[in-house]
């Protein structure tokens, strides 16, 4: 497992902690108890990552090797920044020679070597600003974007799939040949047009669900490996159907 890019709090906490009732609603108390007793939350604190999401990327990379050799990385929906932390480390990015560009409409504390844009990725100016910020051609586009949930599963799925589609078209527009694209999606079916587009442009398209993604969560990740290049992609037939792991 890849080590933390920065030092972290080594104190840790014991699992099985309870939250006092106080004024919290039962549902809020259960969520808080699950959060503070989550082993991935505790590992993130111990290893210096900003969120447990770091381990989702690390687990996917452990099997699919998407970080190795990446010279420049773009991180969409970056806040609070755990994926950007990993990206900065694997690319040896520094403030003097930044090789990671990140974007989110939420605030994010600075990370050495990461150029951060506080901007909605759906803003028409966002793609060009990211291209300027990265200062070269990225080998990897990451997207952990998800629309705010409404509680209505189909609505949440459609809204997050829209973000995934926009991210995928952006990746095809900016990636270096041989590059990879990883994006969050929700279980419930991936739109055929999106899958067909990815199959035309990448050598392999699969769905993955890392162990650190909570079992009850509908979250999955769509991984497209081996970008064929823009000219070649326009003339080739689609690759095999996307597989689920």
Swiss-Prot record:
<keyword id="KW-0949">S-adenosyl-L-methionine</keyword>
<dbReference type="InterPro" id="IPR050082">
    <property type="entry name" value="RNA_methyltr_RlmE"/>
</dbReference>
<comment type="similarity">
    <text>Belongs to the class I-like SAM-binding methyltransferase superfamily. RNA methyltransferase RlmE family.</text>
</comment>
<feature type="region of interest" description="Disordered">
    <location>
        <begin position="1"/>
        <end position="25"/>
    </location>
</feature>
<comment type="function">
    <text>Specifically methylates the uridine in position 2552 of 23S rRNA at the 2'-O position of the ribose in the fully assembled 50S ribosomal subunit.</text>
</comment>
<feature type="binding site">
    <location>
        <position position="144"/>
    </location>
    <ligand>
        <name>S-adenosyl-L-methionine</name>
    </ligand>
</feature>
<feature type="compositionally biased region" description="Basic residues">
    <location>
        <begin position="11"/>
        <end position="25"/>
    </location>
</feature>
<dbReference type="InterPro" id="IPR002877">
    <property type="entry name" value="RNA_MeTrfase_FtsJ_dom"/>
</dbReference>
<protein>
    <recommendedName>
        <fullName>Ribosomal RNA large subunit methyltransferase E</fullName>
        <ecNumber>2.1.1.166</ecNumber>
    </recommendedName>
</protein>
<dbReference type="GO" id="GO:0008650">
    <property type="term" value="F:rRNA (uridine-2'-O-)-methyltransferase activity"/>
</dbReference>
<feature type="active site" description="Proton acceptor">
    <location>
        <position position="184"/>
    </location>
</feature>
<feature type="binding site">
    <location>
        <position position="104"/>
    </location>
    <ligand>
        <name>S-adenosyl-L-methionine</name>
    </ligand>
</feature>
<feature type="binding site">
    <location>
        <position position="120"/>
    </location>
    <ligand>
        <name>S-adenosyl-L-methionine</name>
    </ligand>
</feature>
<keyword id="KW-0808">Transferase</keyword>
<dbReference type="Pfam" id="PF01728">
    <property type="entry name" value="FtsJ"/>
</dbReference>
<dbReference type="InterPro" id="IPR029063">
    <property type="entry name" value="SAM-dependent_MTases_sf"/>
</dbReference>
<dbReference type="GO" id="GO:0005737">
    <property type="term" value="C:cytoplasm"/>
</dbReference>
<keyword id="KW-0698">rRNA processing</keyword>
<feature type="binding site">
    <location>
        <position position="81"/>
    </location>
    <ligand>
        <name>S-adenosyl-L-methionine</name>
    </ligand>
</feature>
<dbReference type="InterPro" id="IPR015507">
    <property type="entry name" value="rRNA-MeTfrase_E"/>
</dbReference>
<keyword id="KW-0489">Methyltransferase</keyword>
<keyword id="KW-0963">Cytoplasm</keyword>
<feature type="binding site">
    <location>
        <position position="83"/>
    </location>
    <ligand>
        <name>S-adenosyl-L-methionine</name>
    </ligand>
</feature>
């Amino acid at each position: 497992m890849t080590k933390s890019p920065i030092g972290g709090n080594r104190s840790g906490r014991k699992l099985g902690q309870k939250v006092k009732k106080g004024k919290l609603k039962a549902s809020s108390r259960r969520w808080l108890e699950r959060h503070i007793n989550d082993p991935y939350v505790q590992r993130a604190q111990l290893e210096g990552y900003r969120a447990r999401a770091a381990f989702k990327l690390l687990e996917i990379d452990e099997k699919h090797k998407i970080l190795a050799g990446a010279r420049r990385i773009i991180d969409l929906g970056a806040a609070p920044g755990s994926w950007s932390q990993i990206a900065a480390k694997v690319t040896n990015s520094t403030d003097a020679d930044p090789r990671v560009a990140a974007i989110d409409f939420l605030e994010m504390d600075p990370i050495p070597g990461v150029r951060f844009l506080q901007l909605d990725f759906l803003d028409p100016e966002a793609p060009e600003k990211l291209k300027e910020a990265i200062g070269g051609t990225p080998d990897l586009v990451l997207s952990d974007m998800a629309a705010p949930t409404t509680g209505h599963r189909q609505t949440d799925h459609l809204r997050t799939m829209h973000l995934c589609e926009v991210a995928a078209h952006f990746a095809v527009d900016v990636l270096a040949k041989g590059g990879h694209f990883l994006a969050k999606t929700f279980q419930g079916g991936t739109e055929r047009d999106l899958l067909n587009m990815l199959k035309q442009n990448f050598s392999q398209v699969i769905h993955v669900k890392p162990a650190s993604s909570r079992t009850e969560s509908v979250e999955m990740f769509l991984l497209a490996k081996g970008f064929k290049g823009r000219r070649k992609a326009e003339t080739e037939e689609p690759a095999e159907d996307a597989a689920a792991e």
